[in-house]
UniProtKB/Swiss-Prot annotation:
Catalytic activity field: a 2-demethylmenaquinol + S-adenosyl-L-methionine = a menaquinol + S-adenosyl-L-homocysteine + H(+); a 2-methoxy-6-(all-trans-polyprenyl)benzene-1,4-diol + S-adenosyl-L-methionine = a 5-methoxy-2-methyl-3-(all-trans-polyprenyl)benzene-1,4-diol + S-adenosyl-L-homocysteine + H(+)
Annotated InterPro entries: SAM-dependent_MTases_sf, UbiE/COQ5_MeTrFase, UbiE/COQ5_MeTrFase_CS
Identification of the protein by name: Ubiquinone/menaquinone biosynthesis C-methyltransferase UbiE
The organism's taxonomic lineage, starting at the top: Bacteria, Pseudomonadati, Pseudomonadota, Gammaproteobacteria, Pseudomonadales
Gene giving rise to this polypeptide: ubiE
Keyword terms, alphabetized: Menaquinone biosynthesis, Methyltransferase, S-adenosyl-L-methionine, Transferase, Ubiquinone biosynthesis
SUPFAM superfamilies reported for this sequence: S-adenosyl-L-methionine-dependent methyltransferases (SSF53335)
The species this protein was found in: Ectopseudomonas oleovorans
Annotated family: Belongs to the class I-like SAM-binding methyltransferase superfamily. MenG/UbiE family.
Gene3D superfamilies reported in the protein's UniProt record: Vaccinia Virus protein VP39 (3.40.50.150)
PROSITE patterns named in the record: SAM_MT_UBIE (PS51608), UBIE_1 (PS01183)
């Protein structure tokens, strides 16, 4: 939060791309962007990152320490790339929750994983990273990949993630 005030009653601002916007408007602006690109998000990611996002995701999986039977939360999981990989690691005795605040992204991810037949141990939940609707100490691993940049109150999101992460979790 930049907390730039233009007077005593001005609302705090936060970043959105290359501009500052009132905090109350950021979630709406982010939602509009992701609703409009959901169907083409993976292609855009390939083009904009030169395919590097695939390496970053592989690196995330390798460092996660996730194994069979674990419970994983993938926040801002969108189209399900990480969730699919985690699903294979945790196996039938584990669980992956793909959470995304954006209904369009969540639908694309759910449809894609169902079409691939890898959604058997994946639950799809529309959720705000700042107010995760899960019990305390519930997950062995919590990831957010590129979604943290779109969260308005990053400190609240991190607190929420730590709350649902088991002691010793990653």
């Amino acid at each position: 939060m930049n907390d730039q005030r233009k007077g005593d009653h001005a609302e705090p601002t936060t970043h959105f791309g290359y501009q500052d916007v009132p905090e109350s408007q950021k979630a709406k602006k982010v939602a509009e962007v992701f609703h409009s690109v959901a169907a083409k998000y993976d292609l855009m990611n390939d083009v904009l990152s030169g395919g590097m996002h695939r390496l970053w995701k592989r690196f995330t999986i390798e460092l996660s320490g996730v194994r069979a039977g674990n419970r994983v939360l993938d926040i801002a999981g969108g189209t399900g790339d990480l969730a699919a990989k985690f699903s294979r690691l945790v196996g039938p005795t584990g669980q992956v929750v793909l959470a995304d605040i954006n209904e369009s992204m969540l639908k694309v991810g759910r449809d894609r994983l169902l079409d691939r037949g890898v959604a058997g141990n994946i639950e799809f939940v529309q959720a705000d990273a700042e107010k995760l609707p899960f019990p305390d100490n519930h997950f062995d691993c919590v990831t957010i990949a590129f979604g943290l940049r779109n969260v308005t109150h990053k400190d609240e999101a991190i607190r929420s993630m730590l709350r649902v992460l088991k002691p010793g979790g990653r």
